[in-house]
């Protein structure tokens, strides 16, 4: 099996198959067209440029195409890139499939669903429990398959469920320390806060934003879903209003995409643990790619900072 692209060092040659995650056309300073390809395997992805692109190349090297690549890893503007020597589409007889290139969550889907189901089972407030169970059941397949984002954090198969399970464990630890928190409300907020992404995003492969995702966003999508669920279940209670508030406020600030700031305790904690889990996985993924004593590439979503891996972290 070929070494994952994230394990290759600068100067090494690469000769392996990739899945094209995205393909974007550009015009070089000499006026000639080129394609920026994001090439993906199970370890991560790397950018490559296809210079002097022909008109047919846009179709030949479109997203979700499997390609055979020969190239060299080099460093450019703080990030690794792949300098292409040769690229071609994979043939039908080459025994490769899209599944071979998809990064997946480290916990099996059935285990994650069992965890989510157990947290719902433990809820004591019937209104919160019924709404949460209803929406999880409605979108169970997508919930277990979709990434949590198109980029930046948990952008892999089952990333949404993995993000939620990690946050549930954080929520439990915090609620153990601060018993005044409403566990049912906090757990429901964790489970539902990003569920609108099953409509906002296109799916787990070559993830992009849907029309609904671009025009509405996952927050407003989920508020609408909550209203529908409450109506179908004939629940007319304040819990519905507070759950909507948790969804609307989980990004924390208007400049981060929240229509409202957190105004109940559980909304504040939901925002913190969402932010914490997203940042932790971004740091961990960046640090996995470097050796002790080295700095990571700059992480745009973390104020474009680099992170250092101490030499005693062998």
From Swiss-Prot:
Residues in HD domain copies: 163-279
Keywords of this entry: Exonuclease, Hydrolase, Nuclease
GO terms (BP aspect): rRNA 3'-end processing
EC number(s) stated in the UniProt entry for this protein: 3.1.-.-
InterPro entries linked: 3'-5'_exoribonuclease_YhaM (IPR020873), HD/PDEase_dom (IPR003607), HD_domain (IPR006674), NA-bd_OB-fold (IPR012340), YhaM_exoribonuc/phosphodiest (IPR050798)
GO molecular function: 3'-5'-RNA exonuclease activity
Role this protein plays: Shows a 3'-5' exoribonuclease activity.
Family from the record: Belongs to the YhaM family.
Protein's UniProt name: 3'-5' exoribonuclease YhaM
Organism from which the protein derives: Bacillus velezensis (strain DSM 23117 / BGSC 10A6 / LMG 26770 / FZB42)
Primary gene name: yhaM
């Amino acid at each position: 099996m070929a070494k994952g692209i994230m394990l290759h060092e600068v100067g090494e040659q690469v000769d392996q198959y990739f899945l094209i995650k995205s393909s974007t056309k550009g015009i070089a300073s000499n006026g000639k067209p080129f394609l920026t390809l994001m090439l993906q395997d199970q370890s991560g992805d790397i950018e490559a440029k296809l210079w002097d692109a022909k008109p047919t190349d846009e179709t030949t090297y479109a997203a979700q195409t499997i390609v055979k690549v020969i190239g060299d890893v080099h460093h450019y503007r703080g990030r690794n890139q792949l300098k292409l020597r040769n690229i071609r589409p994979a043939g039908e007889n080459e025994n490769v499939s899209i599944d071979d290139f998809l990064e997946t969550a480290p916990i099996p889907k059935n285990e994650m669903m069992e965890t989510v189901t157990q947290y719902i089972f433990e809820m004591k407030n019937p209104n919160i429990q019924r709404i949460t169970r209803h929406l999880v059941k409605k979108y169970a397949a997508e919930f277990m398959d979709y990434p949590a984002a198109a980029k930046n954090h948990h952008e892999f198969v089952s990333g949404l469920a993995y993000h939620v399970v990690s946050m549930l464990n954080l929520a439990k630890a915090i609620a153990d320390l601060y018993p005044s928190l409403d566990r049912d409300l906090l757990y429901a907020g964790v489970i539902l806060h990003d569920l609108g992404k099953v409509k906002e995003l296109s799916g787990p492969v070559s993830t992009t934003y849907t029309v609904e995702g671009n025009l509405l966003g996952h927050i407003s999508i989920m508020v609408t879903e909550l209203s529908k669920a409450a109506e179908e279940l004939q629940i007319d209670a304040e819990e519905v209003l507070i759950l909507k508030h948790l969804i609307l406020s989980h990004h924390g600030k208007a400049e981060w995409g929240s229509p409202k700031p957190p105004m109940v305790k559980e909304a504040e904690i939901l925002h913190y643990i969402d932010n914490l889990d997203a940042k932790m996985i971004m740091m961990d993924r960046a640090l996995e790619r470097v050796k002790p004593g080295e700095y990571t590439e700059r992480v745009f979503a973390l104020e474009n900072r680099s992170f250092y891996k101490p030499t005693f972290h062998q």
